[in-house]
């Protein structure tokens, strides 16, 4: 280990220790204190908007010079509306029920010993993410409301934005009963800083990565700290033979074009061959109208003008753009097999008017979120009524799907007796 990496390691460990110490007081914070802290964060973000946007402009300029694509720049960019959305999101989280201290179950043993299962914070959350300044705010708000301290490690491309946001949040916390040490930010842009977080098992209770597949895979494969995996979204929509044409096209266009750069956007369209034969003109018009570039299998290329032949990488790709892979299938089984092979267990949808076909799809496909006649864009904490989310888990333990406040808690068992001993 070099002197530089030793210094980085020491700095990160110091921050993790501070977060762990702050987590002790957060466990005892009242709902009122946590809500007041969130309100203070919201106020300070609005009051310091000019400063935040000025710093964000530095990141955008640097990103463009480095040749980042439009989708990347979009995720990186802030404006007045987005900062106001951050503030509103914090206030919405404040309005949600406190997930801590809830009695999940209780019972009395035959010997009179009373048992209770109660929700408690996870402790210290390590958040590793890329060019997403919104995560800095969203993750902090959810962590504090659920009684957790947080260590933030954003991508180097958003360093000015994140530094400004955390500075403002620290100022806000200084006016509340929540310690500023509950929010730690790793300023180092050295890649070794991220790797140091992987090994902080003594101080950090869980790591949550948010970003591209390479980042998530690196964390999952190398961390000794437990990981809540937020997988990439290679989302599919299957248009069944008995799909309503207007409904199918509307849902498909929404899922692909509403926000192409997010993880719940459509990436692969699977179309039943009979439906495509009968509705190709309407589908082609919709694709052309919205500037969607198709990468298709042999049948799709034959039937959709301008379609490019799809390779193996296209079926695996999270485009995050207006590119769309299209497969023509002869049956529900073929569609489900394709999803089983290439899906990332994020969000999958079927469009059909046949309830039995829909039931078969919903029972067969393995994913965190499944839809019948609805867009995959609803896989979102806010859209599903959870409030904000810290990420969308594609694993099965300890949480799956959009992770809101309850997913940032665990439990402890409390037993109350009167001199009970085990015989």
UniProtKB/Swiss-Prot annotation:
Enzyme class: oxidoreductase
GO biological process, any: L-proline biosynthetic process
Free-text function comment from the UniProt entry: Catalyzes the NADPH-dependent reduction of L-glutamate 5-phosphate into L-glutamate 5-semialdehyde and phosphate. The product spontaneously undergoes cyclization to form 1-pyrroline-5-carboxylate.
Keywords: Amino-acid biosynthesis, Cytoplasm, NADP, Oxidoreductase, Proline biosynthesis
Species of origin: Bacillus licheniformis (strain ATCC 14580 / DSM 13 / JCM 2505 / CCUG 7422 / NBRC 12200 / NCIMB 9375 / NCTC 10341 / NRRL NRS-1264 / Gibson 46)
Gene: proA2
Record-linked SUPFAM superfamilies: ALDH-like
Family membership noted in the UniProt record: Belongs to the gamma-glutamyl phosphate reductase family.
UniProt-recorded name of the protein: Gamma-glutamyl phosphate reductase 2
An MF annotation (GO) of this entry: glutamate-5-semialdehyde dehydrogenase activity
Localization per record: Cytoplasm
Functional pathway: Amino-acid biosynthesis; L-proline biosynthesis; L-glutamate 5-semialdehyde from L-glutamate: step 2/2
UniProt EC number: 1.2.1.41
Pfam families documented for this protein: Aldedh
Reactions listed under catalytic activity: L-glutamate 5-semialdehyde + phosphate + NADP(+) = L-glutamyl 5-phosphate + NADPH + H(+)
Entry's Gene Ontology cellular component terms: cytoplasm
